[in-house]
């Protein structure tokens, strides 16, 4: 290679250098900017590269004459010390770091990333890898306060980044979505925030890289175009074969029938009747259902034929509330699904349809409420080559801005993501215990009585949660307890704490317009006004709106109001904050354009540009607010939405108001895995589901009257049992839902197998506390991921890339839940890199095979890989009831292994000052020795002496983990000095 220009540059030198002009690029500080020699239509005019570290390169592109320098909401300040080399050869600009190389064609702008062995990691397509279209925000999306928006903020760019991707590539991340998809290769995903849907602009590849794009608008992964109405994608025929539309048959509960033609199935939203802007600009949604037809209890069928323009696997998206089934070509392509009427769900599916053939279609819908929703759309067909590409589209940004992150493995890639967006906080230890929640405790007596019952029954629990409406009915946003139901909140908090419990409270960014806090925020221009203008009343009958969390002043005021009414007022007795509806969800079931009008304009720009990032700025308000008034108590937030960078604000996300259905349970497995692999480490769900089918409600009511367990109640109890077993192996172990309430004694009697297994897994969770809290330490100090798709630990085994219902929970436990009713065994794939042990029995299996694992009612399969070291602590009823003076240390033979036990004070920030301890363990399989290293570090209250009962699990010593009996092992006394133990 003949080099025409070579520069050895360190970031320190770059910072002092300005305006250096090379043959094809300009170097200013640590930026390398290229003015493209061939400016293609809709392409960039300039590209700017920044070496952030050896493994991270930032790519910016603009279609304008210069870059707009916006302040990032997700990237923390970077102090790069990376050294790199810049070369030019012909039209190529080459940047080489200690870990990788980026090559940009200065004529076309195409960028290719290589490792140092010249293997391509990722490359943009040669033509059209970066495209732009000018974008102007429609007036209706800005809404009533359009006069506040400067003209420049109304204009930006829609952009698309397009990359080649080999057939054997797999993609993960993008946040939490509900279609039971894990590997996103060839899939489409609309990226926006919604109750049960959390979108994160970060994706990782099994090729050991990730892409983080710095955009806050609505985005699309995969197909950059919107889904089509059925009549735009197909020729439609009614059930009699007449061209033009499908047949819609509506039969109400009294037998009244309406039959009409339907050229599309798009009844996906409702509009407020008093909204002038809606009435003028949007005639769609449920207002196009038959006039006067009573949906509740009805049955609706859409049927006929579709004729496709080309042979393809067509990618559909179903939007549904109530019960839904879909048949295409005589096949059941969507088995029955259900969602409550006020919170519809989206579900994606694919099916082949042949060109030019009238293919039968039948959609069966049973609405479940007076208002309900239904929609079916389809993506325009694309070739397999197009589907296989990596495509990212952003609706509105000032420019294209993405970070390429390389690593030796996916942990390193996620570490790079956290280098950019901030380290994860170390959560309070008690958050890893069991949380009891419901919608909702109605009084302080409810709270205290239920906490006391846990203690009386000796069932482990750490946290009890107060959901919404603890305030007076007409005072949402006051943050004040209603005195009649909560006469002495301080006494309630003191009582919970005296029982060694913790207390979390729900706070929404929502305010009725009559409360003092609304008026104070509004006086500064910090409330969204569209909902007030349109006279939107919530389900309780009152009018209100949300505050503008994008304003620094608004965030400080919001926290001050919380502090004055809840936190300092009650002597810091509230342990955690439940930040609900942080999408923000001003009104359910509205079209996207109106959601934007309801949640803007923001202090930073239009809500179109800042549509997805509300939750991170809202989390900023609470995290920094609490630390400003009580700097040494760990903050913890639970939020219904999330975004890149939120981990730095001690925030966990739960998956929203999901349904109590087996398919929803299964969907949470992939939802949690992809959320975790999007770099956000702490996730949970409403164990047991939130929204309850009427059949389960009726079954519980019958049991309460008669004591009889009918078929529906039997299924309900098994669903709750399986979901709680599943929940034991996710970061946040929390039950929550609507009636029937979810305290274990309300799910089933104490002699019922559902009760017994729920309590057993609760106790197991607490026995695993040394393992769990050490994982939390790894998350903070080593950028670890707790809930891990198998690709993270067994990349290279092609069989793991699409496994949706198995994962590693930390380094030692592979959870394999049951997601179907009356299923008492399941296939389990054991990755080939290691052998495996049954967690309960110690039986050994070779890797690289699929086995049929027993899964009786009271257990789900769990397996442990060879080389694992698993600490198991004492039985406890709350997380810090006992210090782990005796730890059963299970060591699994077959591979060398290592593990680090992490401990600190658990609730404060002294770990930031170095007050913590780590003990390293190493297992040598050939010698059958365990070396316990000298303890590193110290903290107040640390155990100076302890015991380890070291249990070697092997083919010859099959020992499982049991709550009933202590394992046989070798007892070692440890006082902080290194010791090596021979196990055989």
Where are these regions (language model features)?
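Solvent-exposed beta-strand/loop surfaces of large extracellular or lumenal domains
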Residues: 69-85, 328-348, 529-530, 534, ...
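A low-complexity, Ser/Thr/Gly/Pro-enriched, surface-exposed linker/loop concept
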Residues: 25, 29, 48-92, 133
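Catalytic core of carbohydrate-active enzymes
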Residues: 623-635, 642-654, 675-685, 690-929, ...
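Bacterial Sec-dependent N-terminal signal peptides
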Residues: 1-26
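Extended carbohydrate-recognition surfaces in non-catalytic/accessory domains of CAZymes
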Residues: 232-310, 399-426, 753
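Extended extracellular/luminal ectodomain segments enriched in beta-structured repeat modules
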Residues: 307-315, 927
């Amino acid at each position: 290679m003949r080099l025409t220009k070579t520069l050895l540059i360190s970031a320190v030198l770059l910072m002092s250098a300005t305006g250096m002009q090379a043959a094809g690029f300009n170097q200013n500080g640590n930026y390398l900017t290229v003015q493209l020699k061939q400016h293609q239509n809709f392409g960039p005019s300039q590209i700017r590269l920044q070496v952030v570290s050896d493994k991270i390169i930032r790519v910016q592109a603009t279609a304008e004459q210069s870059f707009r320098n916006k302040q990032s909401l997700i990237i923390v300040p970077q102090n790069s010390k990376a050294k790199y080399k810049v070369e030019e050869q012909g039209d190529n600009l080459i940047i080489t770091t200690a870990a990788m190389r980026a090559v940009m064609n200065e004529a076309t702008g195409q960028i290719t990333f290589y490792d140092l062995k010249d293997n391509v990691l990722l490359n943009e397509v040669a033509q059209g890898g970066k495209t732009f279209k000018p974008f102007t925000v429609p007036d209706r999306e800005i809404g009533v306060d359009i006069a506040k928006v400067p003209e420049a903020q109304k204009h930006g760019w829609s952009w698309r980044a397009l990359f080649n991707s080999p057939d054997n590539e797999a993609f993960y991340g993008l946040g939490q979505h509900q279609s039971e998809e894990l590997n996103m290769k060839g899939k489409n995903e609309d990226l926006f925030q919604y109750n049960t849907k959390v979108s994160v602009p970060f994706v990782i590849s099994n090729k050991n890289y990730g892409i983080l794009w710095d955009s806050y608008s609505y985005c699309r992964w995969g197909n950059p175009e919107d889904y089509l109405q059925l009549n735009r994608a197909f020729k439609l025929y009614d059930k009699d074969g007449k061209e033009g539309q499908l047949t819609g048959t509506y039969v109400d509960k009294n037998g009244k029938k309406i039959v009409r033609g339907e050229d599309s199935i798009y009844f996906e939203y409702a509009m407020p009747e008093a909204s002038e802007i809606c009435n003028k600009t949007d005639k769609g949604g449920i207002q196009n259902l038959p006039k006067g037809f009573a949906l509740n209890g009805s049955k609706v069928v859409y049927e006929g034929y579709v004729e496709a323009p080309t042979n393809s696997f067509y990618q559909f998206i179903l939007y549904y509330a109530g019960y839904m089934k879909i048949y295409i070509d005589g096949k059941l392509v969507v088995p029955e699904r259900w969602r409550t009427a006020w919170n519809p769900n989206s579900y994606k599916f694919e099916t082949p349809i042949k060109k030019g053939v009238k293919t039968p279609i039948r959609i069966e819908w049973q609405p479940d409420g007076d208002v309900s929703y239904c929609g079916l759309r389809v993506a325009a067909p694309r070739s397999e080559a197009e589907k296989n590409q990596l495509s990212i589209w952003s609706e509105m940004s000032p420019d294209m801005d993405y970070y390429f992150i390389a690593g030796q493995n996916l942990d390193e890639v996620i570490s790079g993501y956290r280098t950019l967006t901030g380290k994860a906080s170390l959560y309070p230890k008690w958050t890893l215990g069991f949380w009891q929640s419901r919608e909702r405790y109605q009084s302080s007596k409810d709270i205290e009585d239920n906490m006391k019952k846990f203690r009386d029954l000796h069932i482990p629990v750490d946290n009890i949660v107060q959901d919404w409406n603890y305030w007076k009915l007409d005072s949402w946003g006051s943050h004040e307890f209603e005195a009649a139901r909560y006469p002495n909140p301080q006494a309630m908090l003191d009582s919970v704490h005296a029982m060694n419990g913790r207390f979390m409270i729900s706070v929404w960014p929502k305010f009725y317009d009559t409360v003092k806090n609304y008026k104070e925020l509004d006086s500064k221009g910090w409330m969204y006004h569209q909902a007030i203008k349109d006279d939107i009343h919530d389900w309780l009958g009152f009018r209100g709106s949300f505050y503008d969390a994008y304003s620094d002043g608004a965030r400080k005021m919001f926290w001050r109001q919380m502090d004055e009414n809840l936190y300092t007022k009650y002597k810091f007795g509230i342990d955690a904050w439940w930040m609900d509806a942080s999408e923000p969800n001003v009104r359910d079931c509205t079209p996207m354009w109106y959601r934007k009008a309801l949640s803007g304009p923001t202090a930073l720009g239009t809500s179109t540009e800042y549509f997805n990032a509300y939750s991170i700025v809202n989390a900023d308000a609470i995290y920094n607010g609490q630390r400003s008034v009580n700097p040494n108590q760990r903050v913890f937030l639970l939020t219904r939405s999330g975004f890149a960078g939120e981990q730095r604000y001690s925030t966990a996300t739960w998956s929203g108001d999901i349904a109590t259905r087996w398919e929803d349970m299964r969907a949470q497995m992939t939802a949690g895995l992809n959320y975790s692999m999007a770099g956000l480490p702490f996730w949970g769900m409403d164990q047991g589901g939130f929204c309850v089918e009427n059949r389960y409600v009726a079954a519980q009511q019958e049991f309460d009257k008669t004591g009889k367990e009918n078929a529906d109640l039997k299924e309900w109890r098994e669903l709750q049992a399986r979901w709680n077993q599943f929940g034991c192996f996710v970061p946040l172990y929390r039950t929550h839902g609507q009636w029937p309430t979810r305290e274990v004694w309300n799910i089933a009697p104490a002699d019922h197998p559902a009760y017994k297994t729920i309590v057993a897994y609760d106790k197991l969770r607490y026995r695993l506390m040394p393992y769990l809290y050490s994982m939390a330490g790894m998350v903070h100090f080593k950028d670890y991921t707790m809930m891990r798709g198998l690709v993270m630990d067994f990349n290279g085994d092609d069989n793991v890339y699409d496994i949706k219902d198995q994962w590693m929970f930390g380094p030692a436990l592979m959870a394999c839940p049951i997601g179907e009713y009356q299923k008492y065994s399941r296939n389990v794939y054991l990755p080939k890199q290691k052998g495996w042990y049954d967690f309960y029995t110690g039986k050994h299996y070779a890797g690289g095979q699929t086995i049929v694992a027993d899964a009786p009612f009271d257990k789900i399969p769990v397996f442990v890989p060879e080389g694992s070291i698993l600490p198991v602590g004492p039985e406890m009823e709350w997380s810090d009831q006992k210090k782990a003076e005796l730890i059963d240390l299970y060591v699994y033979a077959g591979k060398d292994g290592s593990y680090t036990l992490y401990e600190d004070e658990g609730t404060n920030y002294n770990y930031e000052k170095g007050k913590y301890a780590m003990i390293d363990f190493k297992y040598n399989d050939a010698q059958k020795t365990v070396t316990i290293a000298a303890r590193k570090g110290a903290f107040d209250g640390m155990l100076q002496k302890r015991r380890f009962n070291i249990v070697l699990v092997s083919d010859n010593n099959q020992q499982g983990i049991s709550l009933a009996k202590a394992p046989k092992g070798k007892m070692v006394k440890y006082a902080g000095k290194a010791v090596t133990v021979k196990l055989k």
